[in-house]
């Protein structure tokens, strides 16, 4: 019988994932009992145990239930204190045609840093421009879980990375986002999770001027101190907003959100 470490959550928990994608991953496996756990798409907070059977993939809902003062995980008529105990139980008991044997193999996806990211939260994974990371999970649109070459795992902001392949070198790193002057194409990040998850519209102050390409009529011209009304934060790093009555896009590296109206300039415009 195959064995696996139930305490290694990253090996079996695939995070947000569609039923179709889970089926595709498991149907590429040849043996019964290969499985993964994903988030439920219909009930927030619940999970789905997806298992490769003989000729199909079965999906078993795992309900996260509050019982008195504790949380239990219920699958069918069985309840468990946590997910590792649930998985251990089904390595010894059949679900339909098979017990659990091992987690599904992940598609190895690598990314490379476009900027330095120093991180601001305990869960962040700092990295440098040009550093290669392996994606563990795509938790949110703008924040993913990744692992570095030392094996450390943490959260990274999607706008700071791009897809990587083994043939890339530093010259292939996207240079569409201008760097801070004098920093050798390295952007010292103070980006916070709240920046990318901020309720929009929100206001941001320009911290680096920018003169856009004359042929790009949708790009905003930025002057230090300008206040932009940010209307959209795209994962490619080109945000959208309104400045001086014009709507357009601008690189997120050139602005920082403001949290109050205590500004010597433009305060009457944004309060």
Curated annotation (Swiss-Prot):
Q: Which GO terms describe its cellular component?
A: cytoplasm
Q: Which GO terms describe its biological process?
A: border follicle cell migration; cell migration; enzyme-linked receptor protein signaling pathway; ephrin receptor signaling pathway; imaginal disc fusion, thorax closure; myoblast fusion; phagocytosis, engulfment; positive regulation of JNK cascade
Protein's UniProt keywords contain Chloroplast? no
State the Gene Ontology terms under molecular function: receptor tyrosine kinase binding; signaling adaptor activity
Which residue range or ranges hold the SH2 domain? 12-104
The UniProt keyword set, sorted, is: Developmental protein, Repeat, SH2 domain, SH3 domain
Where in the numbering of this chain does the SH3 domain appear?
A: 106-166, 199-260
User: What Pfam families does the annotation carry?
Assistant: SH2, SH3_1, SH3_2
Q: In which tissues is it expressed?
A: Embryonic zygotic expression is seen in invaginating presumptive mesoderm and ectodermally derived tissues during gastrulation. At stage 8, expression is also seen in anterior and posterior midgut and cephalic furrow. By stage 9, expression is highest in visceral mesoderm of anterior and posterior midgut, ventral nerve cord and somatic mesoderm.
InterPro entries for this protein: CRK_SH3_C, CRK_SH3_N, SH2, SH2_dom_sf, SH3-like_dom_sf, SH3_domain, Tyrosine-phos_adapter
> Briefly, what is this protein's role?
Adapter protein which interacts with C-terminal portion of mbc, homolog of human DOCK180. May play a role in cellular processes throughout development.
Name the PANTHER family on file: CRK-LIKE PROTEIN, SH2-SH3 ADAPTOR PROTEIN-RELATED
Q: Which family does it belong to?
A: Belongs to the CRK family.
* Protein name in UniProt: Adapter molecule Crk
Q: Which organism is it from?
A: Drosophila melanogaster
């Amino acid at each position: 019988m195959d064995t696996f470490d139930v305490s290694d959550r990253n090996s079996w928990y695939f995070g947000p994932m569609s039923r179709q994608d889970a089926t595709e991953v498991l149907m590429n496996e040849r043996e019964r009992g290969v499985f993964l756990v994903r988030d439920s798409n219909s009930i927030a907070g619940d999970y789905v145990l997806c298992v490769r059977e003989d000729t199909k993939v079965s999906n078993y809902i795992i309900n996260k239930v509050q019982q008195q003062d504790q949380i239990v995980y219920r699958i069918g008529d069985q309840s468990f204190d946590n997910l590792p105990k649930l998985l251990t139980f089904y390595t010894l008991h059949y679900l339909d045609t098979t017990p659990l044997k091992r987690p599904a193999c992940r598609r190895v996806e690598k990314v490379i840093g476009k900027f330095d990211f120093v991180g601001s939260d305990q869960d962040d994974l700092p990295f440098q421009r040009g550093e290669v990371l392996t994606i563990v999970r795509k938790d949110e649109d703008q924040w993913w879980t990744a692992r570095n070459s030392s094996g450390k795992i943490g959260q990274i902001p999607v706008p700071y990375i791009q897809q990587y392949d083994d043939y890339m070198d530093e010259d292939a790193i996207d240079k569409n986002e201008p760097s801070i002057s004098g920093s050798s194409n390295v952007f010292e990040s103070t980006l916070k999770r709240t920046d990318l998850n901020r309720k929009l519209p929100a206001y941001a102050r320009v911290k680096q001027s920018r003169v856009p390409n004359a042929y790009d009529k949708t790009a905003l011209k930025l002057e230090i101190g300008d206040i932009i009304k940010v209307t959209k934060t795209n994962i490619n790093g080109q945000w959208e907003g309104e400045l001086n009555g014009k709507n357009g896009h601008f690189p997120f590296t050139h602005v920082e959100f403001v949290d109050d109206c205590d500004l010597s300039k433009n305060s009457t415009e944004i309060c």
